[in-house]
């Protein structure tokens, strides 16, 4: 069975909740989800590791190459050769790609920049590739992540990237 909803368990989603506030304060971490009880198949902590060893998995977690989901959803969030969790500098406006493979069609896929929803796609497909280039990129550091919501309510959160833009003036 599914776990209680956020409304039932903690009084609802708070837009300025724990994760958003921590990111705005400059903390750098990746997303993962897990249950605090014996239920299975209601939350997934997923890791992009170079191998299936303890060392490779821990190394990937230290790089923040992880994401969270409430179902068996594949997410691959990249900006050029960089992936979720990375910190890097670019002289161009960042261009992102998210590849999603869900268990149901995605109702919406939202790109978040510095706590603001800056782009929303409505793919209506269980498998999709979405690209987005930040039209408002400015010099300085911003974080970006992606949240996907399937039509059946299942969610996926691709971990943030921290990108420092050094655009020509």
Feature-to-residue mapping (PLM):
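C-terminal functional module detector
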Residues: 1-10, 17-169
